[in-house]
Amino acid sequence: MFDNIFAAIEKWMRELLSGMVESNLSTMFTAVNQQTSEIAAQVGQTPQGWNSSIFSMIRNISDSVVIPIAGIIITLILCYELISMLTERNNLHNVDTWMFFKYFVKMWIAVYLVSHTFDIAIAVFDIGQSVVNSSSGIIRGNTAIDISSLSMQMQAAMATMAIGELVTLALETLVVSWCLKILSVVITVIMYGRMIEIYLYTSLAPIPFATMSNREWGHVGTNYFRGLFALAFQAFLMMVCVAIYAALIGSIRVSSDIHSALFGTMAYTVILCFSLLKTGSLSKQIFGSH
């Protein structure tokens, strides 16, 4: 009689703990799938598409505050170039009309660049978005984790476990699940931080663009332009990080060792956070921005 009671209690506890573990793991891997898709959706957006109200505010600030400063810089640069051009020609003794034509062309280019700063900057991010969208079809198709297959592996592995091991496993899944939620917040901060950096970077765009037509100061604008491309293509590097992360998660085999699978998932997520943080410096290094 007591054997039947104890067997029934053990069966009930086993079903309870197995259900808890399976639920935690399914929730965890579902969150991994959602996380990878959310990162792909975030990095694939342009500044105006991510938040149009913030973009409009930054553009208005740039047009009303920064462009007048850029206009002053252009004026100083053009005056300096005109004086240098005239003095280089033996104090106006060797003046020809061609050099004035080149000067006016350079002046027109400088004014055009400043007046179309945001159009040029957004064109750069459109290029980055096009690259991300072209790769997202391939990457997203390989990042989805098959939860049903994992569920079958979990059930087979837990069938041979004792009650004590199931209790330990349930606690481990709970801890790892909470850690993944914290890491998910960190990843969200990284995503939002990149977009805020883009808005701050583009808000001062007219000033470096104003220097691009000058030989001595042109490196300021050139370096800024490289920085724009670095920020735009950082999204592609983030997509590659997500693809690598999903491939690592997909290689985990729950049936062999659930404990290792749990902490392996957490370790891979920490690596993802670190990799996403490194994409900014790596992209700047690739494009030669500093």
Label each region the model flagged:
Residues 76-86, 109:
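Core alpha-helical transmembrane segments of integral membrane proteins
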Residues 68-80, 198:
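Hydrophobic alpha-helical transmembrane segments
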Residues 176, 180-212, 226-247:
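Alpha-helical transmembrane segments of helical membrane proteins, especially in multi-pass transport
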Residues 82-95, 184-188, 216-217:
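Membrane-water interface regions at transmembrane-helix termini and the short interhelical loops
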Residues 76, 121-124, 128, 186-189, ...:
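Membrane-embedded alpha-helices of multi-pass transport/permease systems
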Residues 1-73, 89-98, 107-179, 218, ...:
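Gly/Ser-rich, low-complexity
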